[in-house]
Amino acid sequence: MKQLMWRGGQSIPFSREVARADSTVETEGSEMVDQAALARRFPKNFTWGFGTAAYQIEGATKEDGRGESIWDRFATIPGKTHNGESGEPACDSYHRWREDIAVLKELGATAYRFSIAWPRILPNGTGAVNQKGLAWYEQFVDGLLEAGIEPFPTLYHWDLPQALQDRGGWPSRDTAQAFADYASIVIGALGDRVTRWSTLNEPLCSAWLGYLSGDMAPGIEDAQAAFSASHHLLLGHGLAVRAARTARPNLEMGIVMNVGPAIPASDSPEDRDAARRADLTDSHWFHDPVYLGSYPQEVIDFSGVTMPIQSDDMKIISERLDWHGLNYYFPAKIADDPNGDGARTHWGHIDGPKTDMGWGIDASVMRDFLIKLKTHWKTPKIYITENGSAWPDSVAPDGRIYDPEREQYLMEHLNAAAEAIEAGVDLRGYFGWSLLDNYEWAYGYAKRFGYAYVDYPTQTRTIKESGRAFSRLIRASRGG
């Protein structure tokens, strides 16, 4: 059953590039990318932003009444995170949020995607509200608005209160209702200032990596628990959408899904069918119930699990949405594994350069998946809510951070996004991952995704050269 976990990748060749003063990028063995021309392919009202998550940047895990999260507990288990590192102090954004807003302004961002820490609002998951936690997000949202930056919050980005995990976590149906109650509290407080909300970030990772492979918090390896968690995550999403619209009828509600689209390892019928099965357990398992109202029955059959579906659950899960968020980093190379269980697939990587995460690169797969969202699931308007790459960045003697690989990755994927728009996809925005280098979950502080470099001993933020290139493109797109 572990074979269901989200893994794999594909890459395309590229080499180091040289940033030029005339806003082009020259790559050895390839044509020059005209960033100004690329910028003109996006509408002037296109949303340009950056993303983070509360546990990855805030720190202050024991301040002002915040409760323990499953990631706080997970990081104490030997061997679960790099060097036993946790989200304390991360980027210390709880205290340095004004610095983060200044970085956003310098980059030219029009929006900022961040998450709200459930344990900071409800330390026990339910019950009494921690007013200090709520007040912190209120001042932060006000700070963004004063800077002319649209807040784009996520209600849940993997930091379940440990108290709820102790009572069963996402495999328990009670957690879905607890999430809806939490959503009502937050939206009741901030919904007068924030228009666009996402309920969940990447329920696939919460379920498959948290409860199936055990690679992420809470570190459980149980197939039945994982499938129950997947259902209750989506049920919580639907209940939260209903609760939000009850509290604030004019909000725009969405969900954020990650995908690693399956590429067959060969043209053999066996590998092609393995890729189909992999997509069923990845994108279809989470998209189908939200947009089509049902789970892929084939996955239930070959997994041998019992789904805890009750009357009206699928109607709640498929509640109408206003927008859809796509998180894309890499595709997966899939081969048939006749000796495996579950999906009987082998996940791997093709030859070629990889990011510092070991992930392959193919922007065309993102373009094709954007088109699939439109044609197969008929999603509402779409935002690319995460897309980015990690590289082994370092500060040069002149104090700058030269990261041409990240810039090339960005431009290739923005080109793919523009191609999707030209193919008729209603794509409204792009959020680069990430605003800052930060705590990369089980990888600790070993991987850097930021467009701004964080010197962790001093917490100094320095915009990387890729961030400056991105900023030029944003301003060109907006006519600046």
Predicted region positions:
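Glycine-rich, proline-tolerant flexible connector loops at the mouths of alpha/beta enzymes
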Residues: 116-129
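Active-site mouth loops of central-metabolism enzymes
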Residues: 82-95
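Catalytic domains of carbohydrate-active enzymes, especially glycoside hydrolases
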Residues: 96-117, 323
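Active-site region of glycoside hydrolase catalytic domains
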Residues: 28-81, 124-126, 134-480
